[in-house]
């Protein structure tokens, strides 16, 4: 307090204050003497506080310096970069190769996971701690980036489940300069939008893998910023190599689990891929998963789920379909920004009743279907697309008015034809025109195909 404030108080109040501050011999003092004594005590206390603050500042500086020297001392100099897998016990590991456990995995502590709100599927970068003799894995010292963003920015994201799904309304163009007839047909007959849940239904040897590869290359050209995840389950090793070499880029990841791997391996890989896609969508990015095939993934789950006591025809346990349906059902367009597009292949006419049951279970869940026809394939007509049966739900949100009119004319004309005749006629039209725009104008002008 200042002298003026003390002087404004009555003597009795001043004496009470002095007693509260444990000052001795104040009862016989005059008011002016008491005020002088109070001011002297104030000055002493201020000096003590200043000295204490200075000591605390020195201590904090020493702590910071010690922490910096500790980090420098503990820092191994190696930067960890990979996908995080959070285990049931709360800790996690940064996986590097093909999203699976390996010797070079990096341990992430539960405290770091809680502090930054980390989830399975996050891509982390950060320096590792010096490995001691008894440690099997290196440990993450500090987090530099989460999914390419600073930790403070990455923590602001919403949960995938809290985002609002809407119908796909932004088209992914598959037709590019020099694109194949298959891509032109697909772009017109069954267009794909951002957030589409599409299925390519195919008998064996009908060209489904080639079609997926063409889709991936077209998406790379038309949507260079879209993150492309190609998941190959139960495929041949040579096909994995072929796709890896054909499709590469900064936003492309080819994840595989070949037919010689265990079903648990298939399950783990697929769960890591869908977690990775969800984390990207939470940050408002557009992601596309090309899955080959959902039938083989369902077969793998059928072997590892605990028996439910019920069996569908073909020996399929209904409980085995929950996880593949959760995978396929994650595809959606988000109102808040970002989208997850899934294009999966389903096998039919393989001679296995189980494969047909899996297809029947997934039949109504997608919002786009492309049917490949065995008869066309036997006649060596490629692409072997059954055009009358293929299509997209709510295609009016993706096609313009002219394209809608042309498709209406084409479908009405094909109604009475056999599938082979319809495809032959259409293939002739596609070969005579250089682009889909030209084909649309020609169909509208002629009013028939």
Each model region followed by its residue ranges:
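Charged, low-complexity terminal tails
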Residues: 1-79, 83-91, 99-104
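Active-site phosphate-binding and catalytic loops of NTP-dependent enzymes
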Residues: 28, 46-48, 70-74, 115, ...
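N-terminal "pre-motor" subdomain/linker immediately upstream of P-loop NTPase catalytic cores
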Residues: 62-154
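Phosphate-interacting basic helix/loop segments used at nucleotide- and nucleic-acid interfaces
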Residues: 72-80, 181-185, 273-278, 327
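Short flexible coil/turn linkers enriched for glycine and charged/polar residues
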Residues: 76-78, 86-90, 100-102, 118-122, ...
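P-loop NTP-binding catalytic core
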Residues: 130-200, 206
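P-loop NTPase nucleotide-binding module
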Residues: 178-235, 274
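P-loop NTPase catalytic core
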Residues: 207, 215-219, 228-250, 254-449
